[in-house]
Amino acid sequence: MGVLRVGLCPGLTEEMIQLLRSHRIKTVVDLVSADLEEVAQKCGLSYKALVALRRVLLAQFSAFPVNGADLYEELKTSTAILSTGIGSLDKLLDAGLYTGEVTEIVGGPGSGKTQVCLCMAANVAHGLQQNVLYVDSNGGLTASRLLQLLQAKTQDEEEQAEALRRIQVVHAFDIFQMLDVLQELRGTVAQQVTGSSGTVKVVVVDSVTAVVSPLLGGQQREGLALMMQLARELKTLARDLGMAVVVTNHITRDRDSGRLKPALGRSWSFVPSTRILLDTIEGAGASGGRRMACLAKSSRQPTGFQEMVDIGTWGTSEQSATLQGDQT
């Protein structure tokens, strides 16, 4: 709990704070656990005022139990499911991206992580008409590719332009720039500072590995702390502000078993609620469009399910024909 200060709660004045501090009562914990009769006598304060102050502080800082029914009702009213625009991926995600959760896309170089993120952003901006914050940390985002994906969804140039306006792109090439971006979003989300009306619904970070991995290993002890600070910011955006957060991560090889695994270690593995592993299909090669998506972690579905996605057709006439066929 915090330090006693003016404005912390009604009735807590500067004079009262100074008197309490003179008797070693500096924090909320000190005050609520103290003998108020003794404090009133020593500090010359009103006992009734101290009792009222403690009640306010307990109501403001204490944790109160919530029954399961109320929690479920709150979940139903606060959770939205946002389609990615990729049918096979939506199957793995149990219908799409969930607000309040962090979803991680894992894969090696050329596996299609950025293409998946761009497709998600395009679908949320155009199909769902929601705002997206796209944080690019590796220079993989190109406006022309984003426009190409939108052109496959609609031939109306005005609709394309409107969708592009809903996607806010920020470049952050180190951990400090990324933290600044996320903290600024958290601090201003209530003011609707995005380019279009409404707040940001989806945050895409492509990728966390690019800004975190240089800080890990060796004598850089603060790297783990910075990584967990980034994790807290992402979870705060998801859980407290009702956003769907998508991050990309690389893969690395385990030194003992030699198996491939997501980068950033065990501490990071607890951050995403859902993890999708992207891999090239054997024989297709990195230049081919087909990828195998595997559900590696989920709080809703059994893991191990696989779906094939063909990123080579996204933004092409073939995809446009498929979309038109789905609409008829």
UniProtKB/Swiss-Prot annotation:
UniProt keywords, alphabetically:
ATP-binding, Chromosome, Cytoplasm, Cytoskeleton, DNA damage, DNA recombination, DNA repair, DNA-binding, Nucleotide-binding, Nucleus, Telomere
Please tell me where ATP binds in this chain: 107-114
Classification via SUPFAM superfamilies: P-loop containing nucleoside triphosphate hydrolases (SSF52540)
Compartments reported by the entry: Nucleus; Cytoplasm, Cytoskeleton, Microtubule organizing center, Centrosome; Chromosome, Telomere
Which Gene3D superfamilies would you find in this protein's record? P-loop containing nucleotide triphosphate hydrolases (3.40.50.300)
Region (preferentially binds ssDNA), start-end ranges: 1-83
* GO terms for MF: ATP binding; ATP hydrolysis activity; ATP-dependent activity, acting on DNA; ATP-dependent DNA damage sensor activity; DNA binding; gamma-tubulin binding; single-stranded DNA binding
The biological process GO terms on file are: DNA repair; DNA strand invasion; double-strand break repair via homologous recombination; interstrand cross-link repair; reciprocal meiotic recombination; regulation of cell cycle; telomere maintenance; telomere maintenance via recombination
User: What Gene Ontology cellular-component terms does the record carry?
Assistant: centrosome; chromosome, telomeric region; cytoplasm; microtubule organizing center; nucleoplasm; nucleus; Rad51B-Rad51C-Rad51D-XRCC2 complex; replication fork
| Tissue specificity comment | Expressed in colon, prostate, spleen, testis, ovary, thymus and small intestine. Weakly expressed in leukocytes.
Q: Which PROSITE patterns match?
A: RECA_2
| Oligomeric and partner information | Part of the BCDX2 complex consisting of RAD51B, RAD51C, RAD51D and XRCC2; the complex has a ring-like structure arranged into a flat disc around a central channel. In the absence of DNA, the BCDX2 subcomplex XRCC2:RAD51D formed a multimeric ring structure; in the presence of single-stranded DNA it formed a filamentous structure with the ssDNA. Interacts with SWSAP1 and ZSWIM7; involved in homologous recombination repair. Interacts with BLM; required for stimulation of BLM activity by the BCDX2 subcomplex XRCC2:RAD51D.
Record family assignment: Belongs to the RecA family. RAD51 subfamily.
User: What disease is this protein tied to?
Assistant: Breast-ovarian cancer, familial, 4: A condition associated with familial predisposition to cancer of the breast and ovaries. Characteristic features in affected families are an early age of onset of breast cancer (often before age 50), increased chance of bilateral cancers (cancer that develop in both breasts, or both ovaries, independently), frequent occurrence of breast cancer among men, increased incidence of tumors of other specific organs, such as the prostate.
Q: Provide the function of this protein.
A: Involved in the homologous recombination repair (HRR) pathway of double-stranded DNA breaks arising during DNA replication or induced by DNA-damaging agents. Bind to single-stranded DNA (ssDNA) and has DNA-dependent ATPase activity. Part of the RAD51 paralog protein complex BCDX2 which acts in the BRCA1-BRCA2-dependent HR pathway. Upon DNA damage, BCDX2 acts downstream of BRCA2 recruitment and upstream of RAD51 recruitment. BCDX2 binds predominantly to the intersection of the four duplex arms of the Holliday junction and to junction of replication forks.
Protein name per its UniProtKB record = DNA repair protein RAD51 homolog 4
Higher taxonomy: Eukaryota, Metazoa, Chordata, Craniata, Vertebrata
